[in-house]
Amino acid sequence: MIIRAGFHIAFELPQPTPIILMLSVHPSRARDILTGSKIQAAPSLPMHSYRDGFGNQCTRVLAPAGLVEFWDSFAVRDTGLPDEVCFDARRHPVEELPDETLLYLMGSRYCDTQKLSDFAWNTFSRLGSGWETVQSICNFVHSQIKFGYCYARDDRTAFDAFNERVGVCRDFLCRCMNIPARYCTGYLGDIGVPPDPAPMDFSAWIEVFIGGKWFTFDARHNRPRIGRIVIARGRDAADVAISTSFGPSRLAQFKVHTEESIKQPDVAPCGQLRAVA
């Protein structure tokens, strides 16, 4: 399957402002890129690319005052298969977890696990396998928390969402059960499902470490989906903000597109992510 995706965003800036963008496809999908995948700007600006501590591709730019636009459009090869399901995947004792997963057991800015620990253990500790536990948590979040961009608030934590019963894409509770969980952001189009009439946005989901590997779960949609294109992974949304402006800014435009492509694109010579100039 070939998927075409991209974005076009613009900011109004009252003064020259440093910006970090996290909008490039994650390096783990580099070999799947067929065309494009290079952030462009208007006016043309020098950009510097680097990888952060989580392995995400980031772009630094000093944007001038006024209207500044950024965009990218690319084609990516995908298996066309839904998210993997493995009912037998077990939860690992903490002492058996790989060192690199332990970070994703800890509380973080939006995952205030210490406030949710008692509820999580009282509600989910009697369940059997790791898969059953995680799916039960997703079922709870899906049924008890109302999703909507109108509920977005930049200081709402997992505990706040739990109490208010509204929110956007955030993960919680898995870490309270000693299951490593990391936050992912990326593209997820309406492939294999009825089209959503709402304007398209970037999506978010979680990956949990059970059965010796990372599996994808999505409490918002709560079903295996086709065509996820990960951009970034981290502890929570604070680690994977698509843009961070070090000064006043106003979002002037925001468009995202993701769709299955029938036409085969011209393949890029190396099939890998191009460096940002």
What are these regions (language model features)?
Residues 269, 274-277:
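Alpha-helical and coiled-coil interaction segments, frequently adjacent to or embedded
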Residues 214-234:
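Catalytic Cys-His active-site segments of thiol-dependent hydrolases/isopeptidases
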Residues 71-73, 205, 230:
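Conserved hydrophobic/aromatic beta-strand scaffold that supports enzyme active sites
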Residues 1-89:
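Intrinsically disordered, low-complexity N-terminal segments that are enriched in acidic
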Residues 73, 78-148, 156-163:
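Acidic low-complexity segments
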Residues 2, 212-214:
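Coil-to-beta-strand transition motifs
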Residues 9, 130-133, 140-204, 225-227, ...:
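Active-site neighborhood of thiol-dependent amide/isopeptide-bond enzymes
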